[in-house]
Amino acid sequence: MAALGPKMERLSSIDAQLRMLVPGKVSEDDKLIEYDALLLDRFLDILQDLHGDDLKEMVQECYEVAAEYETKHDLQKLDELGKMITSLDPGDSIVIAKSLSHMLNLANLAEEVQIAYRRRIKLKKGDFADENSAITESDIEETLKRLVVDLKKSPAEVFDALKSQTVDLVLTAHPTQSVRRSLLQKHSRIRNCLVQLYSKDITPDDKQELDEALQREIQAAFRTDEIRRTQPTPQDEMRAGMSYFHETIWKGVPKFLRRVDTALKNIGINERVPYNAPLIQFSSWMGGDRDGNPRVTPEVTRDVCLLARMMASNLYCSQIEDLMFELSMWRCSDELRMRADVLHLSTKKDAKHYIEFWKKVPPNEPYRVILSDVRDKLYNTRERSRELLSSGHSDIPEEATLTNVEQLLEPLELCYRSLCACGDSVIADGTLLDFLRQVSTFGLSLVRLDIRQESDRHTDVLDAITTYLGIGSYREWTEERRQEWLLSELNGKRPLFGSDLPKTEEISDVLDTFHVIAELPSDNFGAYIISMATAPSDVLAVELLQRECHVKTPLRVVPLFEKLADLEAAPAALARLFSIDWYRQRINGKQEVMIGYSDSGKDAGRLSAAWQLYKAQEELIKVAKDFGVKLTMFHGRGGTVGRGGGPTHLAILSQPPDTIHGSLRVTVQGEVIEQSFGEEHLCFRTLQRFTAATLEHGMHPPNAPKPEWRALLDEMAVVATEEYRSIVFKEPRFVEYFRLATPETEYGRMNIGSRPSKRKPSGGIDSLRAIPWIFAWTQTRFHLPVWLGFGAAFKNVLQKDIRNLHMLQEMYNEWPFFRVTIDLVEMVFAKGNPGIAALYDKLLVSEELHPLGEKLRANYEETQKLLLQVAGHRDLLEGDLYLKQRLRLRDAYITTLNVCQAYTLKRIRDPDYHVALRPHLSKEIMDSTKAAADVVKLNPGSEYAPGLEDTLILTMKGIAAGLQNTG
């Protein structure tokens, strides 16, 4: 190694640098700095080996200047950092942006390992009293004990509630997962190395080998192109989503249900959760969500369903042989013996395409005889799906396959009953029970696919039909006229149109989607969701189209209400729908309604949206009760706070009383899928949190808010909406300011998802999707959509009457919904930094718009001050020291990336902005004559100067990784 320069001696240890940022350990079991320092040391050594001392020194120097800015908030440090970064040549700036982005990903991994470690320590001590984690964690065992011991529920009541509840997790491919799958897999291996390195019984040789493996994985991740060079298709998104089933969810579900059995035993229930209790269900939108995504065609939907069926049978095939090995007994019930004898006589000779049990199973192994028949059918099911997927037809007859889940469950149930009857229930409750639980959870289709479409598209189809029938234009009819016609057709029998109906491409697309639903087995599908739904006719239209396209088992139709006005009108719309006799008979006492968090937030700001969503749920439940209907709420939450995200447990427990009632559907979007299911322990924790919180909310609902709290919040919401809209929609130059002050215009280059970032190509904030709107403000660490409106609302009620402060503090302490709303905004303030937003303004915003930026930053500071007053906190996050520590450790990297991004945007947007470049720093060690210039060649088609586009995208990804709430 080269001798250390004077600068490097000051920075001899990254460990010391990290400790400078964080004032001491948070607790005895706090190893975060240790983990962080180890990963960064290894990375910096790799950087030095690959690119030389100068570049490593530059990265550390940037880090040091940024750390000084973070501790002293001296704006000159940002200028100093800017000069250092802009003097880099294109290749170097890409390598440095990539290094910082990589360091943030490593910091995330260190943090995940620390969280899991703390959890294990806590479980060993049997101690759940740690306030910080108790608020956001919910252990199923802890919840059951609390319900029985503290809340005096009887164990039988708890068991009954638990086995009848359902949590349906809906995976959606929202364009927010900004890390490539190739990297996610490497991250997973880094995480595993780190866990093993710190385990107690590790030998010196193990340690050495693990350290080598760790370095290998860190280097492999660094050498992988972080940027997606092509936009993913819906099929890519589906395959990415399905990979989580393969890797964690498939085995995670039975493992979790065993833990539930153990927790029940500990409160005195000696029964297991029945294998067919629908505790956890999975659905998906990948390949079914066509709202604003023209790339999701009927063919895509068909492919995705066949692919999921193929994957499900493949997973069962891979496990059935383990079960055949386990069930080698000869004792069995007469019922099973008779079945086995019949099968034994009818089976063919050998099956050479199997590795195990390829010879005919002897009759004295009756369970294996039964299971080998199941295996044949699973094999045929998989091969038939594979052939249909690749060529559109299959020679395997359908009767040789499994067409519904009963055909798979029935022989397994027979084995289970027989084992129990022969005194072998201990064996029955092993692998066989796990298998039965998997079949009950995943069925033959792995997940149920929801279809989502805009209501307008259905109106177009019906308009074409009524015009074709010569009875007028459906689009022009009043709501009453529409309902009358739809109901008369639904009550009648005649087909509405033939093949000669004149169709545009859009109309064909809608009808062909219904034909795909009719053609495929009904267990492939879940709900049909109508976005932008406003009236009963929107729902009836889908019912009629399902009938016209011969859907034998119609999908349940779910209206989605998302804008503020739609949420306000939703209860009345639902009441009108329930008062239609035909519809009430059709739904059989069950209805689902989806509420959208993203668009309501974009439309009115976070405070008003959160309160309106709360009230809408209360009203909708009331309407459903009046009509004797069980209502399931489907929550369309994003990963970020601006789009309704936040800790799961808190989010569920802060819902209004009576709104969950043991059935909950919730979306798991984009990057949240990786955070929830990326590892076995994360998957376990996710299933546990949802199950425990749903049970607790049902059995111990939160207090209903006092009338005076409601009145105060009503008043605040009006002021907040007014303030939010006066800036976002009414300030004439706001859109121009937004486009200049953030990287919104450049966002589309990230190739995150298959969906366009705008609903309409031109247009203002209205047409912009909620994700890029939030993403852009997150990048500049200003988070405007989250906090805007809160300050004005607080100020208004405090100026009216200072006693309102006491009431707000009482609401914060006693009302979970209000507390969660405030805490999440506080967390966003802790991640925000108006100084960084000011840098973007200084570099990118035209002079005459500077006052608008200054006004918004003053508003930010004032809102933060008022929020702390309401929460009764002196500093941000004083109640959550762990989170505070984690954020401090990341700040310096994120700041460097912010500065790099702001200056890169300046160079992209202003051709007259010239910088003095220093000579190359980076040396490719393999060939010392070659600088890092090669990385510039990865993007030959860029319309910008060399290297700028990649540097920009790398900063976006790095900041997203650092703030962990992408869009």
UniProtKB/Swiss-Prot annotation:
Primary subcellular site in the record, as a coarse category: cytoplasm
Q: Which residues form a coiled coil?
A: none
Catalytic residues as annotated in Swiss-Prot or TrEMBL: H174, K602
Instruction: Give the GO molecular function terms.
Output: phosphoenolpyruvate carboxylase activity
Q: Which residues carry this modification: Phosphoserine?
A: S13
Summarize the activity regulation. By light-reversible phosphorylation.
Tell me a GO cellular component: cytosol
Q: How does it assemble?
A: Homotetramer.
Q: Which family would the database say this protein is a member of?
A: Belongs to the PEPCase type 1 family.
Q: What is this protein called?
A: Phosphoenolpyruvate carboxylase 2
Gene encoding the protein: PEP4
